[in-house]
Amino acid sequence: MMRDPATRGVFGLPTTAAAGGRALRRVQLLVTAVALGGIAQAIAAEPREHLHLAVNLRGDYSGAASAGFNLADVSTQSALKALPEGMRGIYWLGNGYNLHCLWQLSDRQVTDTVMAVKDNPKFSGIYYISDEPHPALCPDAPQRLAERTALIHSLDPRGRTFVVVLNGSAAPTEFAQLKDAADYIGVDPYPCNVRNEVAGCNYAALRERIDQALRAGIPNTRVVPVFQTFGQACTSAGRNYSPYYRLPTLAETKTMLAIWDEKVPVKDRPFDMAYSWGRQPTVACPTLEMADGSAHPDLRSFYTDYFARMKGASPAR
């Protein structure tokens, strides 16, 4: 191919076939490399949007958004459409392999859902596929979750799957068994309960649960911190248990978040999650929605400030 010797190269420098042209081109390449390197550094230095998930909103999207949450769990397209500006949905695909060893939604239903939402601008690209699956009860749970993740990836290559793993004392190998079953693994230790109301939350147990996930081979970039923002003092009389968990105080919340920040730094985590924003009559009450400083500690303002401070954090590499 013949080129005009007066053709302009990068940054307007002329390229010629005359003596010294090769040296000039080397200078051009060097200048280009330096410029691109500077651009790459500038992009890397730009703070990314940190993502915060609120669950059980019961339609209170604006309330959660005002507290700094920019992700909401949704299970219908109408809920996705109702999200306010700046908030995106994590799509709940129904539970599976938790209390029953099957999926609530069939592969066909999941396929239809993924195809319907994957390009929606209000969708985050994250699919919540199971909440606390138990391989001890359902030995094929790791395989079935991995298959569902593979199905979603085949339909939405940019999509990511999310599962919360308990890994409690009764089943301490769940992290190891489920670490490859989904893209993001939620870790949900709830260290504040009625037994330690005087002594304070069990921070050692919180640290140990996080360490268990990391030792199982789940990197920080896949760990989703699940913050305790609920108690059970006002759950309904219809429950079949005695209330155990209690809403953390402001001081306890500060300590818990400091531990999370140490173990799973803000710059690494894909997003974080608060359980729970809204009440669940037999499971969670009071919750973050209620913790506004009136009858309960003002955890809402505390989380608003915590999220605001993240905006200057460095992006994940």
Report each predicted region and the residues it spans.
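N-terminal secretory signal peptides that target proteins for export/translocation
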Residues: 1-24
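Short, well-ordered helical secondary-structure segments
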Residues: 17-18, 26, 169, 174
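Amphipathic, positively biased hydrophobic alpha-helical segments used for protein targeting
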Residues: 23, 31-33, 236
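Bacterial N-terminal signal peptides
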Residues: 28-38
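Sec/Tat signal peptide C-region and signal peptidase I cleavage site
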Residues: 39-44
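Glycan-processing catalytic domains of CAZymes
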Residues: 45-317
